[in-house]
Each structure stands twice: as structure tokens, then as C-alpha cells.
Amino acid sequence: GVSTLAKLLNPKIKVIGVEPAGANCMQESLKTGEVVTLPQVNTIADGTAVKTPGSKIFPYIQENLDDIITVHDDELIVAFLDMVENHKMIVENSGLLTVAALKHLSVKDKRVVSILSGGNMDVITMSSVVQKGLILRDRIFTVSIQLPDKPGELCRVAGVVASVQANVIKLDHN
């Protein structure tokens, strides 16, 4: 629907579709020229995790789409973190496909519209996505060390952590 309206308003506009790499049924369908069913899908973008594209919309997509690209789940995770931290917006993973796709496109000095949609994400999923995003950005990591069992050793490690302006988020001591 969006591609049809965009082309109707401006026939010269370039419309680029985006799918998760783990659920790229439309991309595969466009390659073959007919609706393709994937054997399986694997993506965190659950709102677009379909094996088969809609047969009724397929002809419109063929007619109006200039290109289609895929993005990986890690890119969606980083896009989520960017939206939360930089724009104070919560957008579900499927709704972030266009944001993640921008990293693949040459958009400097161009007018670009990136459609964001949906905020249907429970707090457990949100927490997991934020955690993974921080790991992907090398902002948190796990360190496992073995210390002698004597007083002051943990304090010594804490001193090293503090000396590099870092924080301990969680500590497991066995």
C-alpha cells in the first residue's frame, strides 16, 4: 500500500523494501518472479517472520519496488538501542527494519523517508534486546577470573575496574 501510494504521488521516487535476513520470503519471491515459501524463518523481527509473502500484494510489490534488501538480527538490535538512547523511542524489531537498512544505503545528501511502526514489545524482550545491543557495541562484557581465596583479592580487582572508569554490573562469587 505504501509503495503504491508513493509511486502514485511521485513516479520517480525510489522505493526500497526491507526484510529480515532470516525471513526473506519476498526477496526470494522477487528473484523467481513467483511467490516462494521458505522452509523456515529465524528472526527476532516476529511481526515480519513469515514463510510466504501475501499472494494478493505480490504483484504490487513487483510493480512498485525498486530494490529489496535484508538486515540481520544484530543490526535490528543495534537499531533498537540507537532509537532508545538517541531518540527516546521504543519501536518493535519489525518496525526497525528501515532504520537498520539505512546503514546499507548511501543516503548522504538525499531525502529519505524511513517508516517506523509498532511498539509491541514486552519488557522481557526489551531487556534482552538492550543487553544484546550493549554487548554488540562492546559496552558490556563478561570477565571470568580465578582469584586466590584470601581477603582483599576482590577489592584489588575492583580497584583495577575503577581505575579504567568502568563499573561492575553483576558479580558471581563461588
Which functions belong to the PLM regions below?
Residues 8-23:
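Short, acidic/small-residue loops that bind anionic groups at enzyme active sites
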Residues 38, 58, 107-110, 115, ...:
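Active-site loop ensemble at the mouth of alpha/beta enzyme cores that anchors a bound cofactor
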Residues 41-44, 50-63, 132-147:
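Active-site pocket-lining segment
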Residues 54-110:
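Active-site-adjacent helical/loop segments in soluble small-molecule enzymes
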Residues 6, 26-44, 48, 132:
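Anionic-ligand binding region
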Residues 126-174:
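A conserved regulatory-domain signal marking ACT and ACT-like small-molecule sensing domains
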Residues 1-3, 23-27, 94-102, 115, ...:
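Short glycine/serine/threonine-rich phosphate/pyrophosphate-binding segments
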